UniProtKB/Swiss-Prot annotation:
It comes from Stenotrophomonas maltophilia (strain K279a). Belongs to the UPRTase family. The keyword Transmembrane helix does not apply. One of its GO terms (molecular function) is magnesium ion binding. InterPro entries: PRibTrfase_dom, PRTase-like, Upp_B, UPRTase/APRTase, Ura_phspho_trans. HAMAP family: Upp_B. This is Uracil phosphoribosyltransferase. 5-phospho-alpha-D-ribose 1-diphosphate binds at R78, R103, D130, P131, M132, L133, A134, T135, G136, G137, T138, D199. Pfam families: UPRTase. It catalyses: UMP + diphosphate = 5-phospho-alpha-D-ribose 1-diphosphate + uracil. Its EC number is 2.4.2.9. PANTHER family: ADENINE PHOSPHORIBOSYLTRANSFERASE (PTHR32315), URACIL PHOSPHORIBOSYLTRANSFERASE, CHLOROPLASTIC (PTHR32315:SF4). Allosterically activated by GTP. One of its GO terms (biological process) is uracil salvage.
Amino acid sequence: MKIVEVRHPLVQHKIGLMRNAALSTKDFRELANELGTLLAYEATADLDTEPHTLAGWAGPVTVQRIAGAKITVVPILRAGLGMLSGVLSLIPAARVSVVGLQRDEETLQPVPYFERLTGRLEERDALILDPMLATGGTLIATIDMLKRAGARRIKGIFLVAAPEGIEAVKAVHPDVEIYTAAIDAQLNDKGYILPGLGDAGDRIFGTRVG
């Protein structure tokens, strides 16, 4: 499995700012989108291109264009939406596929409740967006969903990832690539990443549970 912890100074600076518990909703949301852009830049560095000849100001010129079908971006509801605008600012022609999962309180396993995927997935790179890769259960379920629909090349983009989640995904889907701003120390007994960011969904949307 390809695992990339992006060590670019701007990425490290921004993820550091997000760890501040006193950070405003506005600033947290803006940083999530900015990091979405930077991480997507890294995740798309190996896209295939093909030559294309067009009419330049001084005559014909050959340029490079992205080959194949448009990328699909796959935000996981709801927190993944907090990174979507940043990724689309980099890839404005991307198709958007949306998935939603919730935990079954008896089995503790993620259960899909919403799925709206673009067509021709077998021809597209799929970029999954979720601020946190914690236990890996949600990501595994999302990858399962995409592969059933025909997706072959899948990458996950996360603000923060836990080693336990990475290993869980690696055991089931070693062909998937992971891009993250930080691989943190561990999960606590409630499945939260330490030191982490807290509940990224609540911090992006300005809500609190309970």
